[in-house]
């Protein structure tokens, strides 16, 4: 569950259950939207948490538009189909990502380490490795 007090939106979901968003207009089922050929990638991130590793990764993408939003909303924008990619190459903790990852995966997206394995939880270390969340 991710709640956005500023907008009154609530997101929930996961895996085999699908994902939804509720706002003043009601409940909407969420679906990711992969980038189409020739479409500029919509990348979510944070200008304040960018580092050299993130900048190097972004440089490999070609043309993209950076959408700066906070915390779990990055995953939610991917789940809504409003963005395509969220590279996080700086530290986060399990509690920063778990709920939002479930919502993204329920909408059809993925969250993987840089080695291509799914981001996992209940590890000995509470810090997450670097990861990329994607809409495809």
Placement of each model-derived feature along the sequence:
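Oxyanion/phosphate-interacting regions
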Residues: 56-60, 75-136
């Amino acid at each position: 569950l991710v709640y956005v007090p500023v907008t009154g939106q609530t997101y929930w979901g996961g895996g085999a259950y699908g994902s939804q968003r509720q706002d003043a207009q009601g409940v909407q089922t969420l679906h990711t939207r992969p980038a189409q050929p020739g479409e500029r990638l919509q990348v979510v991130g944070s200008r304040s948490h960018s580092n050299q590793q993130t900048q190097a990764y972004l440089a490999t993408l070609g043309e993209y538009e950076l959408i700066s939003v906070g915390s779990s909303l990055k995953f939610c924008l991917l789940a809504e189909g409003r963005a395509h990619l969220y590279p996080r190459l700086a530290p986060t903790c399990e509690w920063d990502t778990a709920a939002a990852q479930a919502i993204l995966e329920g909408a059809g997206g993925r969250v993987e380490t840089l080695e291509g394995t799914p981001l996992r939880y209940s590890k000995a270390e509470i810090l997450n490795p670097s990861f990329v969340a994607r809409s495809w």
